[in-house]
Amino acid sequence: MLTFTTMNVVGFCSIENLHIPLNPSCTILIKAPNGKGKSTILSALVWAIYGKNLKGVSEVTTWEKVRPKDYQGVMVEVFFQKGEHIYKIIRCQKCNIVLEDGAKGKDRLILLKDNEVVNVKGKNKLQDAINAELGLSYTLFMNSIMFGQGIKRLIQESNSDKKKIFEEVFDLEFLNIAKGIAMQDKNNLLAQANEVEHQSALLKKELEANKEAY
């Protein structure tokens, strides 16, 4: 079972500093007028996990004209539990905050498993590792967990994207494998049938030749 537990947000869009539990024992209702940053909280979660927000945008620093004087960039930490293991994702953007390893956040992406850094080189490969641990791509996460104003629904996706989503949800890859095996068996049977037909034609010619000889 996958459970998101806690999120810490610094300098993300309109959020200056936020600590929020993600798995309380009760339902949380966040009420505020339009434009006051309700969806920004969820956007921070998505960005921390996938590197792009609810609308697919990766740039999430606070607007320069409204930044506080001590603004140090963006850092979002997300904790989640899967089985017996505890994970922590740290994603930074133009971040001057010094992290636990003694280095500045800058534009770093870090994944920890049971408080040990997952040693994968390169952001793309590390993102693949995060997706694998979650079992959810960005598209599937947005279509199955996140629903908000202005977000594309599954029904609006292209047929190819729908196919990819359904394959991810229902693990339909085995159908493609089975189709490949069936096609290979079919080709083998056709080859055998063609060989039998060829041998039959040769025998027929030989029989006709023998008849003429007698």
What do the predicted segments below correspond to?
Residues 1-117:
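Extreme N-terminal "head/tail" segments of very large remodeling/mechanoenzyme assemblies
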Residues 78-82, 123-151:
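Flexible, charged interface-and-hinge segments in very large macromolecular machines
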